[in-house]
């Protein structure tokens, strides 16, 4: 246990005056759940923690590739004091992502299962009274193929800001997004799980001291994309009231596709199923064991690009798909028509989104590759289907970003900047503009800080890598300790911004730097060692790419994987 955050888990009755005299038990629609009290040093009010609360039936058997169903009721007091298994995924990659991003001091050993539709709740409310605190529902990232709830401890955010934090899980990879493109398996099962979790929150969170009329959804990377999809989805209407997308939106390249039939057929073939009809593929894949589907997952080499063979046969993600249910139309069309959930919205990116963690996990560009403009052009052409770039646009982009330098390290940095702009920067600004133009209150930020928790393998020049803001949002400097006063204050400031937004739909508050609304002046906040206002985030890049991509037929990049 670190000096800065001694976490006391009270598994017996409290003895101190004013503390609860027994463990927390709360009623849900399905039955009673037993939690535990946890306190953060320096705070008298403990947080009641409930881990592994079921919000849907286990998605097994005929419920594989099917919408989630309500959890079965129980008549006993369910013990919810230990972490649920994460949804099925590559266990090695899953552990790596957990260890890189967690705000825990200790690395926890993870378990994985197809039976994974559970959520974790952290509530500072006095459960003997009818508190109605703001609710913040976190949707984890991981490319829709990795990640889980228990990486993120909501204790610091909940304690410091007096909010109820709910961390949800959703089916991933083949289990979560397998789509034949028709009624046999429409896909987006993971997004339907997210919607089911939000319904559960509406039905139950008041018993945990939360206000079902003040729910903020927030997420990072594929979690940010999920938040953006839910903002655009008619299914999620009235299930949340504010939204925050960190480093991921519904226009993020590679995460949303119009049609994933070729991938469905590849999954079937790799699994040893016939791919002749949708019905036969779904029937055969439902007979496979969880271990067999995991074997298929590993053979698909998710999160990596095949730069030697036909790159169109390389699938780094099993993406969100146009299903006519979660997404009635492509995100671009929904944004243009201004027909979506116009809740207050924070959208942000990090300064070097493709700085280290993503290139390392995807081995893209290959670490041993000497980069010159010709090599960079070839590399981008091999991944143009993923980045949604027309091949004819690539030489123009390489010329703009690489600027004719002979230094391979400089070329690599510029290529990483190009990819970061295409995948994260430009789409985030376009979504923010669309949200603003629909009349909704919008805020933008760019995170510019290198956390002390960064991997020792990360080059010291990488500041504001993908995922770096999570440490601050979840209070890692407070929970893990051993960091500077500057980093602790940055975390406290970000938690305050996020929680103010959850309370009021506006991040501003006393003692904080002013965060301008993202209006026609396009003011935004640069968050880091120095936090200050700026204007027109990525304006030149958005103009460049918009002009360049105007030569591309509408949605051409979405027609196939």
Curated annotation (Swiss-Prot):
EC number: 3.1.1.1
Residues annotated as glycosylated: 79, 107, 489
Keyword Transcription regulation found: no
Intracellular or extracellular location(s): Endoplasmic reticulum lumen; Microsome membrane
InterPro entries, alphabetized: AB_hydrolase_fold, CarbesteraseB, Carboxylesterase_B_AS, Carboxylesterase_B_CS, Type-B_Carboxylest/Lipase
Family assignment from sequence similarity: Belongs to the type-B carboxylesterase/lipase family.
Protein name in UniProt: Carboxylesterase 1E
Species of the source: Rattus norvegicus
Gene: Ces1e
């Amino acid at each position: 246990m670190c000096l800065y955050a001694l976490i006391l888990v009270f598994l017996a009755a409290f003895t101190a005056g004013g503390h609860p005299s027994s463990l927390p038990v709360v009623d849900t629609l399905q039955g009673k759940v037993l939690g535990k009290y946890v306190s953060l040093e320096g705070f008298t009010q403990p947080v009641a923690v409930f881990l592994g609360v079921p919000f849907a039936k286990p998605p097994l058997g005929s419920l594989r590739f099917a919408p989630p169903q309500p959890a079965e009721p129980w008549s006993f007091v369910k013990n919810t004091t230990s972490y649920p298994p994460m949804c099925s995924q590559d266990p090695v990659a899953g552990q790596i992502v957990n260890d890189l991003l967690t705000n825990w001091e200790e690395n926890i050993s993870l378990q994985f299962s197809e039976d994974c539709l559970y959520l974790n709740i952290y509530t500072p409310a006095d459960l003997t009274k009818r508190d109605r605190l703001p609710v913040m529902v976190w949707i984890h990232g991981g490319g829709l193929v990795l990640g889980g709830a228990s990486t993120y401890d909501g204790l610091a955010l909940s304690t410091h800001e007096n909010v109820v934090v709910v961390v949800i899980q959703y089916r991933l990879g083949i289990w979560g997004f397998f789509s034949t493109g028709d009624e046999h398996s429409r896909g987006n099962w993971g997004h339907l799980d997210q919607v089911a979790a939000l319904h559960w929150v509406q039905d139950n969170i008041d018993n945990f001291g939360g206000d079902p009329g003040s729910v903020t959804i927030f997420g990072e990377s594929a979690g940010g994309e999920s938040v953006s999809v839910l903002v655009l989805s008619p299914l999620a209407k009235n299930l949340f009231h504010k939204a925050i997308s960190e480093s991921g939106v519904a226009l993020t390249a590679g995460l949303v596709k119009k049609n994933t039939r070729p991938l469905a057929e590849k999954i079937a073939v790799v699994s040893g199923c016939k791919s002749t009809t949708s019905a036969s593929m779904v029937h055969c894949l439902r007979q496979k064991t969880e271990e067999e589907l995991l074997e298929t997952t590993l053979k698909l080499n998710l999160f990596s690009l095949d730069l030697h063979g036909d790159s169109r046969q390389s699938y780094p993600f099993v993406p969100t798909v146009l299903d006519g249910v979660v997404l009635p139309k492509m995100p671009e069309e929904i944004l243009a028509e201004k027909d979506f959930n116009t809740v207050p919205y924070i959208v942000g990116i990090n300064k070097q989104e493709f700085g280290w963690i993503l290139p390392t996990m995807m081995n893209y560009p290959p670490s041993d590759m000497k980069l010159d403009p010709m090599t960079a052009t070839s590399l981008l052409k091999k991944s143009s289907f993923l980045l949604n770039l027309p091949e004819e646009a690539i030489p123009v982009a390489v010329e703009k970003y690489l600027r004719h330098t002979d230094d391979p390290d400089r070329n690599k940095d510029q290529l990483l900047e190009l990819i970061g702009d295409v995948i994260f920067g430009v789409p985030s600004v376009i979504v923010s503009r669309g949200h603003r133009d629909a009349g909704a209150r919008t805020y933008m930020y760019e995170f510019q800080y290198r956390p002390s928790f960064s991997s020792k393998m990360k080059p010291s020049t990488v500041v504001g890598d993908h995922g770096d803001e999570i440490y601050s949002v979840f209070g890692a400097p407070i929970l893990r300790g051993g960091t500077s006063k500057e980093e602790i204050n940055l975390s406290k400031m970000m938690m305050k911004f996020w929680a103010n937004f959850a309370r009021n739909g506006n991040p501003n508050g006393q003692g904080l730097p002013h965060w301008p609304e993202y209006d026609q002046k396009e003011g935004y906040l640069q968050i880091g060692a120095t936090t200050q206002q700026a204007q027109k985030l990525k304006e030149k890049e958005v103009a460049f790419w918009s002009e360049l991509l105007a030569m591309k037929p509408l949605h051409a990049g979405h027609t196939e994987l």
